[in-house]
Amino acid sequence: MNKDQSKIPQATAKRLPLYYRFLKNLHASGKQRVSSAELSDAVKVDSATIRRDFSYFGALGKKGYGYNVDYLLSFFRKTLDQDEMTDVILIGVGNLGTAFLHYNFTKNNNTKISMAFDINESKIGTEVGGVPVYNLDDLEQHVKDESVAILTVPAVAAQSITDRLVALGIKGILNFTPARLNVPEHIRIHHIDLAVELQSLVYFLKHYSVLEEIE
C-alpha cells in the first residue's frame, strides 16, 4: 500500500482482503463485471460502505456499469502487495499452531509461514507441514528479516516472547493468546481470542435476534 493509500480508515483497510478474495473467485468463474449490490450480497457489507471504501482509491467503477472484475483484481493485488512474498514466523507448535502450519495460508499467494519455534524437544528439529521447527531458545539465531509473527503459546509466556520479538524487529503480531500484550506504539498487534469470540456468539444468540441487530 503506497503512502497516500495508508491514510485510508483502518476499517476500510481490514475489508480490502475480503474484497480481493471475492474478486479472485469471480475472476476464476469468468465473470467480467460486478455491481456494488452483488459485492454487498457476497461479502455481507452494505453497498454504501463498499462504494465509500472504493472511493478512497479514486474512480474504480462506472455508474450504470459497475466494476470491471479484472481491473479491480489487478488494482487490489497491487494495493495489497500480493506480488510480494511475506514470510511469517510462528511461535508455539501446539494444537492450534500445528493446524496453522498444515494450512499455511495456501489460498494467499503472498503469505507463508517460513519457520516455527517451540520448547517441546519432540518437535524441535522436525518439520510440520513442510515448515521447520526450531528451539525457541534459538529464536535470535534464526529470525533475520521477518516482520510478522503468529503467537500461539500459553498466556503466561506471551509477554516475554513478545519482548524478544520486538527486540528482533518484528513489526506485527497476530496474537491468539488470551494475554493483552504491552508493546511500543509502532508495533501493531491483532488480538484473536477464540474463547471470547465463541462466548460472544453464544451470548448474542441467547439475547439478541438477527432482526434486532439489523434494526
UniProtKB/Swiss-Prot annotation:
Q: What keywords is this UniProt entry annotated with?
A: Cytoplasm, DNA-binding, NAD, Repressor, Transcription, Transcription regulation
Which GO MF terms are attached to this record? DNA binding; DNA-binding transcription factor activity
DNA-binding region per Swiss-Prot/TrEMBL record: 18-57
InterPro entries, per database record: CoA-bd, NAD(P)-bd_dom_sf, Rex_DNA-bd_C_dom, Tscrpt_rep_Rex, WH-like_DNA-bd_sf, WH_DNA-bd_sf
**Where is it mainly found?**
cytoplasm
Keyword hit for Cell inner membrane: no
Superkingdom to which the source organism belongs:
Bacteria
Cellular component, GO, one term? cytoplasm
Question: Do you know which Pfam families this protein is assigned to?
Answer: CoA_binding, Put_DNA-bind_N
Q: Which Gene3D superfamilies match?
A: NAD(P)-binding Rossmann-like Domain, Winged helix-like DNA-binding domain superfamily/Winged helix DNA-binding domain
UniProt-annotated location(s): Cytoplasm
Any idea which positions bind NAD(+)?
92-97
GO biological process terms, semicolon-separated: negative regulation of DNA-templated transcription; response to redox state
Family label = Belongs to the transcriptional regulatory Rex family.
How does this protein assemble?
Homodimer.
Q: Name the HAMAP family on file.
A: Rex (MF_01131)
- NCBIfam families, A to Z: PRK05472.1-3 (NF003989), PRK05472.1-5 (NF003991), PRK05472.2-3 (NF003994), PRK05472.2-4 (NF003995), PRK05472.2-5 (NF003996)
Function of the protein:
Modulates transcription in response to changes in cellular NADH/NAD(+) redox state.
Q: What is this protein called?
A: Redox-sensing transcriptional repressor Rex
The organism is: Bacillus subtilis (strain 168)
Quote the gene name from the UniProt entry.
rex
